[in-house]
Every structure is written in C-alpha cells, then in structure tokens.
From Swiss-Prot:
InterPro entries, A to Z: Ald_DH/histidinol_DH, Ald_DH_C, Ald_DH_CS_CYS, Ald_DH_CS_GLU, Ald_DH_N, Aldehyde_DH_dom, BADH
A GO molecular-function annotation: metal ion binding
Gene: betB
Protein known as: Betaine aldehyde dehydrogenase
Modified residues (Cysteine sulfenic acid (-SOH)): C284
Organism: Rhizobium etli (strain ATCC 51251 / DSM 11541 / JCM 21823 / NBRC 15573 / CFN 42)
GO biological process: glycine betaine biosynthetic process from choline
Cofactor: K(+)
Organism placement in taxonomy: Bacteria, Pseudomonadati, Pseudomonadota, Alphaproteobacteria, Hyphomicrobiales
Length: 487
C-alpha cells in the first residue's frame, strides 16, 4: 500500500500498534484504492497516550517559552524541507490537488510552528499592577493535557494549528485526526520529535466517533479543541461541560459573500470561486451564499459560468488539476443529494450539477456547481453542504442584504466586495460572524485570529489570541507591609 505508516499511533515518541482496534482503511479519493490500513485506538491505547502526555507535561512547562519555541521553529524548518513529501501525502489523504496542498497545507502548518515558536515570549507575558505600597502580578500558566480533534479537510494544518499554541504554552497534546484522513498527523508527530520535542508531548491516536468520548470524558484532560460539524461540536461541548473542561469549537458555516454593484467583478468572481471551489468546496469558512446586487447579477453570472466551466477536473497528483474529488464516497453522495434538492426546489442551474465525465475509475468527483435565483428558504441556502456548490442570491440594497445575511444559525465568516471602503467597514460591523474579509476571501494567515460566533463555535485559532485558550491567568498579590487584621 502506497502510504502505509509504520504503525497506527504515535505515543511517547514512537510508533505504536494495537491490532485489537477496529480496522480503518484509508482510501485515495481519486480512485477508491486502499492506500493504508490502520487500527482505531482501543481504551488501552487512549490511556497510554494520555498517561504519556501527563507524565511529560510538567517538565515541559518548566522550560522557558524561548526554549520551547526553538523546538517548534526547528519543526517548521523540517516541514518546509519536506514540503513536497508532505504535500503528496496530504493529496493522497484528502484528494485535494497537489497545486493546492503544496502551497496551502504543510506550509501553513509550518507557519504555525514558526509563528508560535517566535512570538510566545511576548504572548505569554503577564502584567504588573501597582497597588500603593503593595503590588500584584499575573502570569499565564499551562492547562495540562489538551486534546485536539481534527477534521478531514486540512488534516496537517489542523494538527499544527492546535499543536503549536498548545505546546508553546507548556501543555501536552493528544491529537485524534479524522478517520477519513489518518495519515498526515502521524508525520507531524514524527517531525516534532525529530526537531527535539521530548517524548510524550505530542501524541497521535486514530479513531472514530467512539474514540472521541474516551478522550473528552477522561479526568486527566484539561482542554478539548475540536474542528468539525455543529452536531459533533454540540456533543463534545456537552460532554466537556460535565467536568468543566476548557473548550474551543471551530464548527461549520453557511457564510455570506456580498457583491455590491460597484465591486471589481473579476475580483468578486475570483473571490466567490475561491470561497466555494477551493479544496473541492470542503472549507468551513466558505462563502456559499453569494449575494449579488441586481444591477450586476447578469454580468457576474456570465463571468462566473465561463470561469467555472473552464476549471480542470482530474488526477489530484497532476499539477495542472484545479479541482479534485470529494474526500469520500459518502461525502460525494451527500453533495449530489443537495444538488438534486436545489434543482427540485426551483433554483436555476448555471454550471455543473453532476458527476464529471472526464474522469474514470471509482473516484469521488463532483462538478463545481453554481445555482442562481436561489431564495433564502431553499435547502441549499440554509444548510452546510461542504462541497463545490455555490448559491447565488440577488438583492436590492444594503439594509436588505445585511438582514438576510444574518438570518442564519451560523456565524463563522463572511465577505464584502465593494469599491466603497466606508460601506465595506459599515457592512462588516453589522454582519454576525467571527471572521470577515473585504475585497478578498478565505485568506487565513497564522498572524490573525480565526473563529466564529453563534452556532459556528467559540474560541479562536491562530494569532496571540489562541494562547488565551491554551493557558489561564494566575494572579499573585504581594503584600509589602504588616498585615492589618481587625482581630
């Protein structure tokens, strides 16, 4: 098998196998070929991973942030040196085109290790509070053992986005990737230990929906960070609440992308395509509700149709390929069902709408699809599809589109395209979302916070803000004189 790892799990600095666990077959989405066979973690494996993390964490926390940071920066360097290898693995794991993974996946993970490795001494500083002759100070302290639960759209990136702030803050982590994409996180663990990370601090275990509760409910776990769907987030948050664990939730979205009639239409079309078709539409922050002002709707759709139909669908390992398969057969079937629902409910099919005929074999392909004349009550305008399906809705004025854009249970992200920057800032101020873009879309450098509101989750990934979610404040009051007691 072309991507078989040394073993299913990485615990305490080494690969570990336990064949008693349920078999997990990793399939290459372009062909359906089995490329690796692993085993889900048994309760014994879960205990082994958490115990290793618990043992290793105190000594790691006692190191200076600068010393911890040096290791993370070495890991970033190794990831960049091995970018091609890691990118090809990510393509095999997810089906995303190599032209994407080579610029967006391992590199963004390396960015996270480099950023947190370099800025932590400043980000973890406390404060000094003068109180007359007395004073107080605060310091940030680690939480302990953190659990990261990843999604299947950006497996390597997510492992790094969670691992980097957790580790630099002095924590240990047990990371569980999605069973659909089990391979990348193992390589991240291997690289971290090659960079000098002490044993037990970053452990990877495989599993499915039965494994998560073993991690979330474990008494030695202090924090859970999940990237996943809203239903999964609700279950995890409810379980974590029972023992008052710290929680970060990065969940789904049905985000609005608003195009005003003064926008640069070519840029707006490009932004809409990036916000719907990148990674075959499997991006939580996608702007899948594209609101276009009526005066430019026809021209917008004309340009969008031409560019969408020109996209090259094919073998993800071919660098010319622009759109690859869905991650799994089940996800492809789900997306096809939504496309049929859009047709049945009266939306106008502009482009795509089915399975491409230029690919052969058992791959999980879907054409990039555009619907126009979509109304707010249609299923494709309300529910997260997580595939390459764009809904174009029209609008008359600013107040109307803001009201409609906010009429969603989700609040992850949104975007505005307009030449009027005063209007752009006015609109984003009123949009109910955690991450917003003006005249661009879906750019998420590690320097900026990323996260949502409403049913799209809470807490933030990336930037110095992430350190607040992997540490807590300790306050110390220092008395400088005799105690004045009334007793």
């Amino acid at each position: 098998m072309k991507a078989q790892p040394k073993a299913s799990h990485f615990i305490n600095g080494e690969y570990v196998e336990d064949t008693d666990g349920t078999v997990i077959e990793s399939l290459y989405p372009a062909t359906g070929e089995v490329i690796a066979r692993l085993h889900a973690a048994t309760p014994a494996i879960v205990e082994k991973a958490i115990a290793a993390a618990k043992r290793a964490q105190p000594e790691w926390a006692a190191m200076s942030p600068m010393a911890r940071g040096r290791i993370l920066k070495r890991a970033a360097d190794i990831m960049r040196e091995r970018n091609r290898e890691l990118s090809e693995l990510e393509t095999l794991d997810t089906g995303k085109p190599i032209q994407e993974t080579i610029v967006a996946d391992p590199t963004s993970g390396a960015d996270a290790f480099e950023f947190f490795g370099g800025v932590a001494p400043a980000g973890l500083n406390g404060s000094h509070i003068p109180l007359g002759q007395d004073f107080a100070y605060t310091k940030r302290v680690p939480l302990g053992v953190c659990v990261g639960i990843g999604a299947w759209n950006y497996p390597q990136q997510i492992a790094c986005w969670k691992g980097a702030p957790a580790l630099i803050s002095g924590n240990a982590m047990v990371f569980k990737p999605s069973e659909n994409t089990p391979l990348g996180a193992l390589k991240i663990a291997e690289i971290l230990h090659e960079a000098g990370l002490p044993k037990g601090l970053f452990n990877v275990i495989q599993g499915d929906r039965d494994t998560g509760p073993l991690l979330v409910n474990h008494p030695d776990v202090a924090k859970v960070s999940l990237t996943g769907s809203v239903p999964t987030g609700r279950r995890v948050a409810a379980a974590a609440a029972g023992s008052l664990k710290h929680v970060t939730m990065e969940l789904g979205g049905k985000s609005p992308l608003i195009v005003f009639d003064d926008a640069d239409l070519d840029s707006a079309v490009g932004g809409a395509m990036l916000g719907n078709f990148y990674s075959t539409g499997q991006v939580c922050s996608n702007g899948t509700r594209v609101f276009v002002q009526k005066a430019v709707k026809a021209e917008f759709l004309k340009r969008l149709k031409a560019r969408t139909e020109a996209m090259l669908i094919g073998d993800p390992l071919d660098e010319a390929t622009q759109i690859g398969p869905m991650v799994s057969w089940a996800q492809r079937e789900k997306v096809i069902a939504y496309i049929e629902k859009g047709k049945a409910e009266g939306a106008t099919l502009v482009a795509g709408g089915g399975i491409p005929n230029n690919v052969s074999g058992e791959g999980y392909y879907v054409q990039p699809t555009v619907f126009a004349d979509v109304t707010d009550d249609m299923t494709i305008a309300r529910e997260e599809i997580f595939g390459p399906v764009m809904s174009v809705l029209d609008f008359d004025d600013e107040d109307e589109v803001i009201t409609r854009a906010n009429a969603s249970e989700f609040g992850l992200s949104g975007g505005v395209f307009t030449a009027d920057l005063s209007r752009a800032h006015r609109v984003v101020d009123r949009l109910e979302a955690g991450t917003l873009w003006i005249n661009t879309y879906n750019l998420c450098p590690v320097e900026i916070p990323f996260g949502g509101s409403k049913q799209s989750g809470f807490g933030r990934e990336n930037s110095l803000a992430a350190l607040e979610h992997y540490s807590e404040l300790k306050t110390v009051y220092v008395g400088m004189g005799p105690v004045a007691a009334p007793y």
